[in-house]
Amino acid sequence: MKIWLDGGLQDIDSARVSVLDHGLTVGDGVFETAKTVAGRPFALTRHLDRLARSARGLGLPEPDLDEVRRACSAVVEANPVALGRLRITYTGGVSPLGSDRGDHGPTLV
């Protein structure tokens, strides 16, 4: 199985998110789950609009929705199934312990 992590497809067995990612340490992140049918995410535009709105609500940097679309397409193409789920996770990224965000930038899975 392949996943998207910060700019490219990776094998699920080797992909790693830092334990210092703010999505893990303080819940600083948002996610969407889209149904996929015949290799296409259902209502992807609505899901991405909600992802961006939720990110703004947390004060996260605006997600690059073109990159998110490319990621979704790449993951669906790399993992062909007739019916599936596509989980999009966007976090504050690697940051120091505590509530301040670091300079590393957001994480996209």
Q: Can you name each region flagged by the protein language model?
A:
Residues M1-V109:
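Conserved alpha/beta cores of soluble small-molecule-handling proteins
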